[in-house]
Amino acid sequence: RFYATQLSSTQLRRADGLNRQGIEAMSFATDYYSNNYPVELLSLATKPANDFQVWYEWKFCYTIIHACNDAIANLHKADMSANKLARYQCEARFLRAWAYNRLNMLYQGVPVYLEPINNEDCTRGQSSVDEVWQVILDDLTYCINNPDFPNNTLNEDYGRPSKGAAYALRGMVSVSYTHLRA
């Protein structure tokens, strides 16, 4: 659902970005539009907390994070093989790492939730940038080290997370982390 409804509605306005995904282009210096609505880059703008972009990015990423936390905590209850369970756990951790990376790049430290919660429990304070990076790296390392997580998904299950994607995201996170600490 995430891939079909969120990423597909975001497109690049011009092709001079660092990658082809419009959703990622916001992190860098590429214009983009969403459903024909041009938007300033969040990383280059000063926006109030009630701005639509700020609200939407926050909601979008935490929706992914909470869905992943729910999956990680409850997938074991489903009737499936141990290999499939391990793979789905890795996919959920990968997506959670992706969302936390997005939030950390935009907001420089955010509240970290690693277990399912209720709305009234969303009161945690901001974690430091370093703490969030560590959560991301831990999730990606878990995926990379798991033998049931496929090396790539180019032939079957195209578009699903894989070790290759986890290595790539971990590399991006490491570069960002090193750059921001310098």
Please place each PLM-identified region on the residue numbering.
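Active-site catalytic microenvironments for nucleophilic, acid-base chemistry
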Residues: N74, S176-Y177
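Amphipathic alpha-helical protein-interaction segments enriched in hydrophobic
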Residues: Y158-L169
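Short acidic-aromatic linear motifs embedded in glycine-rich loops, typified by GG[WY][YF]DAGD(H)
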Residues: R1-E91, L95-Q134, P150-T153
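Conserved small/polar residues in nucleotide/adenosyl-binding loops
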Residues: T178-A182
